[in-house]
Design a protein with these regions (language model features):
Chain A
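Extracellular beta-strand repeat scaffolds in secreted/surface proteins
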Residues: 45-49, 404-406, 465-470, 523-527, ...
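Glycine- and acidic/polar-rich repeat regions and solenoidal domains
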Residues: 58-60, 85-90, 104-124, 134-423, ...
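Short, compositionally biased
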Residues: 60-69, 118, 476-487, 540-546, ...
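Bacterial Sec-dependent N-terminal signal peptides
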Residues: 1-24
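Surface beta-loop-beta hairpin patches that serve as ligand-binding interfaces in beta-rich domains
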Residues: 423, 428-508, 751-769
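Acidic Gly/Asp/Thr-rich repetitive segments characteristic of extracellular carbohydrate-active
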Residues: 18-56, 60, 66, 458, ...
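Right-handed parallel beta-helix/beta-spiral solenoid domain characteristic of secreted/periplasmic
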Residues: 22-29, 51-113, 133-137, 507-510, ...
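Short sequence motifs at beta-strands and strand-loop junctions characteristic
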Residues: 29, 326-328, 449
């Protein structure tokens, strides 16, 4: 044995000595020093960036480390090296590690914040770890970039926190164009993807792997053990567009979208958690397009989305689809998943649209139903019975349903061979995890290669005692999936804006504009009764509430600024609540408007119990501006030339200017044009956005000068509900023209001398693809 | 050591004993015995079929052998077990071997002759070896079958001889529909694929792997070390339609077609031989569609095909192509191949058809040029200089040309970066193999993963001394690629019909019909001068020549059979040469016609120095009949209602009735309709067939009753040449309407009082897909 040891040691030394190791550590404090250190680095080098703010820094990390001796670029103290301004980081070489940097207060001057390529020099075996990218948005939402852009092979993004992207482009993208970037085995693991607000249009995925044009490539990207929290950018949280990607052990927490196999085939979706919210229909699950995907051991809780956003959406394809549209689903396996308290969790033939053949070309008709697919050994549990746990939007003969079980609390549903109602109970292991209280005795179907499903959700072996559903063993320990210390960096703690609001009293003697400018994030400005004259637009770039001190004796704000300027100028990140006030113009101004450009983030606006009058526009959203929430509640809007205009996105590429618009208990009187004008253009079945609720409101003497003759213009908006309103003496042709095929509804409206409310089933829109 | 040995022996015995071995051999002589033996078989069983003819036998070989102890079904003597009549063979199970059977004189009653599946029971690890399938055709060419149909995984077809398929359907097909049949690693190795005649339309590949609808699947089929000899069925000899297939070491000998990566990606085409013929433009090479294929170490000699049939055709794709059309070429590597005496061997953007945008929909326009592809380290050698060794049908900026060399004997050509004219010599190693006489000193380009090209054409290592071209070492030994003992069975020898012709003298006293019926294959019937009266159609089902004994004193045959019956009835395999005769009808009969149905094989007809008169039709080809060669030389056709009609395929699916039609030195006089009527319908860019040559002939007083007003109607025929003819006093609108975009030409014709000869560039045809 001794001899062997000596030989092994000698061998080790021999191998080790072949490679010149550099264990030196060099600290750099300026860009020039950093550049020099990179140029001088050799395997084993450590470059330490000094704490502090690095402004306008473009790191070009070129080098060649080795597997045992990588070259490392790290923060002196993780999180205390701030990269801001026009900055980015690009890798070119092998075995390079970046550790502990913090990107904030800036944006990339290039197409990416972090990229695994410099010109044609693609990175391999490189790593970004323990870093943060936060709100590093380009100035306008139509300026595209990626925050992390993969090329090459075997690169890793791990233990990072990434949040707040609002401009166009997926947060993370894997590029596959070129043989150097296929079979990449990249790893995106243990990250925390924090909130991404809705973009109001396409191209806002959190992760996109490939594009349709490279969807034939073998990718083998692993996305595992990440937390996706409120990733609401668009309908796809993850868009897999290549072959052999794997999605394992991720937690999708209240994220408005789905994990979608959009293009490409043979992906594995195993052991993920999808956690919804009782009231949120935007939170989806898994949406399947294409061939050979295996969806196993997933746990889906409280998901209420439908159709494209169903807990499981197995789509119809377009026969012989072109490369960038919808491939037929074939050879898919959905096995050993659990759906707990989801609404109609299993939906097949989603996107079936034969009924739209008159408004769409044949190449857009999804009539190819799923075939040669197996749905087996799944478990559905409902605390309250579901009348349609399985929804067939088209024929489902191509699907082999085997040994699925449901506890539907006795509620009847359309029976289906292979879905058996049985009685079993579930225990809450934690708030979000329910596991069967007893071993479920139902037989397990053994399909082709089902022996490869050898572990359950918790990684326990299925060999000895297999069971239907995602969990085999009732005696499991809490895996703490929402413990945020398991994801992201070891230093960043999410900045929870305190809800303790500073209250600032303002009287007529004060300068209201200054008070607002000086106020802290989240402040409340409380106005004494009286009249406040404003002569210049007040910029709103933070969260702020302006209200009357005494709601029974409202203050009045009179705006006398320039024509076509707003009293309140909504800046990026501006969140204004206006409450119990009167706001008056002089007929030529706007009450509220976004910036005309550089809306790098969204704004929100809430108006309650106010009276707004004598403006040219009540609200004008300029092109490229976006608001997640706009609401007018209990307010009066009167004597204005225009009302609420959110219709500046006229390119018909699916973009729109606001996600949620709510009008409740309001009175609109003598609003002459664009009473409500809310627009989304471009045919894209997967867009699920734009929401307008108009209820319990009255509209009178409005629309006299409206060119298109429609009082509430909602063209192309997907979700519209108009109910319990009264329309009196509005000289228009139509109160509204609703889109029947989408989620457009109306009820209990009283219409007198105001035109008709018409529903058109299939709206003709411009094709986007 | 002794202990170890004992232990190993014990272990072996233990493992061996776990599996019940059956070394028994059972001989069977009847279908019932065979069925019983199969039912009783266990691992190791050998079932021996008795020599003799087995008629109408449907073998269902179900069983479960093991890797070490397969179940074998073998001929008592290989080749002496004849399977004939309505017979087929299907496998269902594991580790089953069939050895030595001979399928002939029959056809499959099912969709396949040999199939690796019985109902839903797919075969795995099964083998067909040392068998022959010969002329086992269904009765009509539109009746589809496959002769070997793969399903499941790890099945093998080896050392078989397979020839003579003329009905619709690839000879061998691999099916990939269903997860059980993907990643199949089937092996098609060491076979001899003998002649397959042209089918006259699509679906006559020798091997097809998958279909477009399963083209996203990983297939991994290996096609290696096979000989393809005169595989002329259609434009594709091998049609690869799935991913990761490998084509290695095959010999394509004078086969009219190409190896095509029609759908699917990442195939390997390595070390194959493509051997052409000086004068045959139908013999192609390698045609590339799709992504990521590697074409390396191939040797291509004497190939004269162009465009779709070029020695290397890299195609243009359709942007965002639908699943069944043409994908763009991307990420392809063409390296270390040798083209010797090929015409314009490297063609890029093949199929570019923007010029046809007026007659084709956008979804048929191939405008997507090859991108991200590398063409490097290839060698071109021309004994006679080639002015265009590289043809760019569209832009070639997407291709990286590196370190390619050409010896063009000083002939200038369009220069191209990356193709260097240098001087080097080649030696003939054998008739068909030329290797460099000296080591070529040119630098080798090292592209991405080029280190995987570690061997050359002959399997010699490239590690020590790499070189441009397919061969690294000048000192190589003949690998005898055309030694037929290397391919196919160990018992079958190809039946070369002797060219020693029996001469049979016939006088007016003899019964001509009986003499013809009795004649051997290849006989010559020589007629004394005089008149021969025939009252019934004479069937021609073999190779036979009928001629006058004295060409200066021609015999006359008068046919007085029923109206609309032919003097000579062309049966399957009928090959008639008629020479120096007069053939006369009584106005209502046909001189020649095919069978009306059951044309299970083609017929050929050659008429020289004859006078044919007073028929309703000279030649009538019925629907589903097909002739490879029809020629009229030095003959007179006169006073007939119709001439030569080969236009029965009116379904517009690309089929046609004859491959080669030649009219030379003939006189057509008073042929009133369908003077020549030759038709192919259906738009399919890859169809290259139908050939009509009309030269040095005269046409007078013809076409008076022709409805369409065209004398020589060649609608849809790809190759037409009309030259040096004289057209006089033919009352038609057009002599011919030629298709300019195809290979239709005319020259030196004299046209008097006979309408015009018009060329239309883009013919409007029915879309087939």
């Amino acid at each position: 044995m001794k001899k062997h040891l000596i030989f092994a040691l000698l061998a080790y030394l021999f191998i080790a000595c072949k490679e010149p190791i550099n264990n030196s550590s060099v600290k750099v404090s300026t860009p020039a020093e950093l550049e020099e250190a990179i140029a001088n680095a050799s395997p084993g080098s450590k470059i330490v960036m000094a704490n502090g703010v690095w402004n306008d820094l473009q790191i070009r990390f070129v080098g060649k480390g080795t597997s045992n001796n990588p070259i490392t670029l790290k923060a002196e103290t993780p999180g205390e090296v701030i990269i801001q301004g026009k900055s980015d980081l690009k890798f070119g070489g092998e075995h390079l590690i970046v550790d502990g940097l913090y990107f904030k207060n800036g944006y990339s001057p290039s197409f990416s914040v972090i990229e695994f390529k410099i010109d044609e020099n693609k990175a391999n075996n490189c790593q970004v770890t323990n870093c943060v990218i936060e709100g590093f948005n380009k100035l306008q939402r139509n300026q595209t970039d990626l925050w992390v852009l993969f090329h090459g092979r075997n690169n890793t993004l791990d233990h990072c926190y990434i949040a707040g992207k609002s401009n166009r482009g997926p947060t993370v993208r894997v590029d596959l164009d070129g043989n150097e970037s296929i079979k990449n085995y990249h790893q995106i693991v243990n990250n925390h993807f924090g909130p991404r607000p809705p973009k109001g249009g396409a191209s806002a995925e959190t992760i996109q792997i490939g594009t349709s044009s490279t969807s034939m490539t073998p990718s083998h990207t692993l996305v595992a053990n990440n937390l996706f929290e409120h990733c609401n950018g668009e309908v796809e949280i993850i868009s897999s567009k290549a072959n052999y990607n794997e999605f394992r052990g991720n937690v999708f927490y209240k994220s408005e979208g789905s994990l979608v196999t959009r293009h490409g085939n043979y992906c594995t979706i195993d052991g993920n958690y999808f956690i919804g919210d009782e009231d949120n229909e935007n939170i989806g699950g898994i949406r399947i397009i294409g061939t050979g995907h295996w969806i196993t051991n997933n746990y889906l809780l409280n998901l209420k989305g439908q159709n494209f956003r169903s807990p499981l959406a197995v789509m119809n394809g377009i026969p012989k689809s072109s490369l960038n549209r919808y491939k037929q689903v074939t050879d898919v396996v959905v096995a050993h998943n659990s759906w707990i308290n989801c609404k109609s969790p299993l939906q097949f033939g989603v996107g079936s649209n034969l009924s739209q053949k008159d408004v769409l070309p044949a190449s857009e008709i999804r009539s190819a139903v799923p075939i040669r697919s197996t749905v087996a050994n799944n478990l559905i549990y409902n605390t309250i019975g579901d009348e349609s746990p399985v929804v067939a939007h088209d024929k489902i003969e191509g699907i082999n349903f085997k040994n699925n079980i449901i506890n539907n609390q006795g509620t009847t549903f359309n029976t289906l061979d292979g879905l058996k109602p049985i009685s079993f109970e579930m225990n809450s292991l934690t708030e979000n995890i329910m596991v069967p209280s007893n071993d479920i005795q139902e037989d397990v179907f053994v399909g082709f290669e089902f022996e490869t499903i050898d572990k359950d959700l918790f990684g326990n072996s299925r060999a000895d005692k297999n069971a239907v559903g995602a969990v085999v063993n009732k005696d499991v320990v809490d895996s703490k999936i929402l413990d945020k210390s398991k994801y992201g960096t070891d230093w960043y703690s999410i900045n929870n804006t305190t809800d303790t609001k500073t209250l600032s009293m303002v009287s007529q003697n004060d300068d209201l504009a200054s008070k607002i400018a000086e106020a802290d994030e989240g402040s409340i400005i409380s106005l004494e009764a009286g009249t406040y004259q404003i002569e210049k637009s007040i910029p709103i770039d933070k969260k702020i509430t302006i209200q009357s001190k005494d709601e029974n004796n409202k203050a009045t704000i009179i705006y006398s600024g320039g024509a076509e300027t707003p009293a309140f100028e909504m800046n990026p990140k501006g969140e204004l609540t206006l409450s119990n006030l009167a706001l008056k113009g002089e007929d030529t101004q706007y009450a509220f408007a976004s910036l005309k450009k550089n809306m790098s983030s969204l704004y929100n606006l809430k108006v309650s119990n106010c009276e707004i009058s004598n403006f040219d526009y009540v609200l004008k959203g300029y092109k490229l501006s976006f608001s997640e929430y706009i609401s007018f509640v209990g307010s009066t809007l009167k004597n204005c030339e225009n009302g609420i205009e959110l219709s500046a996105e006229t390119d018909d590429k699916g973009d729109y200017n606001a996600e949620n618009v709510t009008i409740e208990n309001c009175q609109f009187d003598n609003i002459r044009k664009n009473v409500i004008d809310y627009y989304r253009g471009g045919y894209d079945e997967s867009t699920v956005g734009g929401t307008l609720m108009v209820s319990n409101s009255t509209f009178s003497n409005c629309g006299a000068k409206e060119d298109n003759g429609i009082l509430l213009n909602t063209y192309g908006i997907i979700n519209v509900d108009i109910s319990k309103n009264t329309f009196t003496n509005n000289p228009v042709k139509l109160v509204a023209l609703l889109w029947g095929a989408k989620n457009n509804t109306h009820s209990d409206n009283e219409i007198r001398n105001s035109g008709k409310l018409v529903v058109e089933e299939n709206l003709k829109l411009k094709l986007m693809y």
